[in-house]
A protein has these predicted regions:
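C-terminal binding/interaction regions
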Residues: 3, 22, 98-99, 103-167
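Short, ordered loop/turn segments at secondary-structure junctions
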Residues: 30-31, 62, 89-90, 125-129
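Glycine-rich phosphate/diphosphate-binding loop of Rossmann-like nucleotide-binding domains
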Residues: 12-62
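Electropositive phosphate-/nucleotide-binding environments in soluble metabolic enzymes
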Residues: 33, 37, 41, 62-66, ...
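Glycine-rich phosphate-binding loop
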Residues: 67-109, 165-167
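Short helix-capping segments at alpha-helix termini
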Residues: 48-53, 80, 115-116
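Structural motif
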Residues: 25, 67, 82-84, 118-124
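SAM-dependent methyltransferases
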Residues: 1-23, 165-166
Length: 167
């Protein structure tokens, strides 16, 4: 939850997993590419910074945010992909179109998480204006692509800890 005076793209990096051999898919909506390219750059750089290798980061492009759901399902269903990051931007318009898209994508990505038992990260911005979107793609509110990548890393690290509880 971002506020006017807070940049949330600062994370605790305690206890992060070793990402050697971990494969990520980043699915990027082409609509509003001025923003989504910055989100992708942030996510990619964060994965590299914390130990992922470039050859283990796969990029897939989709026309718009609505298509993120199916593409994330395809990637998450692939046994070789460990986590999927969905990046998009749906800006408020004059109609309720954005409400329908945002709800469908959020619900769809939630369902992909549950169906595949893999981290599928919702990195879709839902701003009122392009200015707000840019503020969250490397501007005063940080880069939500960074946050999506860190969320994927932390979720990958959590699963083995939970599995150990089984004994």
């Amino acid at each position: 939850m971002s506020s006017a005076d807070k940049n949330l793209s600062v994370f605790s990096t305690d206890d992060l997993p070793d990402l050697t051999g971990t494969k990520f898919a980043i699915v990027v909506a082409e609509w509003n590419s001025e923003v989504t390219e910055k989100l992708f750059a942030g996510a990619y750089q964060t994965l590299i910074q914390y130990g992922a290798s470039a050859e283990n980061i796969i990029r897939g492009n989709v026309p718009g945010s609505f298509e993120l759901t199916l593409a994330t399902q395809w990637y998450a269903s692939n046994a070789q992909v460990d986590a999927v990051i969905a990046l998009g931007v749906v800006i408020q318009g004059d109609t309720k179109h954005n409400d329908y898209i945002n709800h469908a994508v959020a619900q769809g990505i939630t369902q992909v998480n549950l169906n595949t038992s893999k981290p599928v990260i919702f990195g879709v911005l839902t701003p009122n204006t392009m200015e707000q979107a840019l503020e969250r793609a490397g501007g005063i509110h940080g880069n939500k692509g960074d946050e999506a990548a860190m969320t994927a890393i932390k979720m990958i690290g959590l699963k083995p800890k939970i599995d150990q509880l089984k004994g």
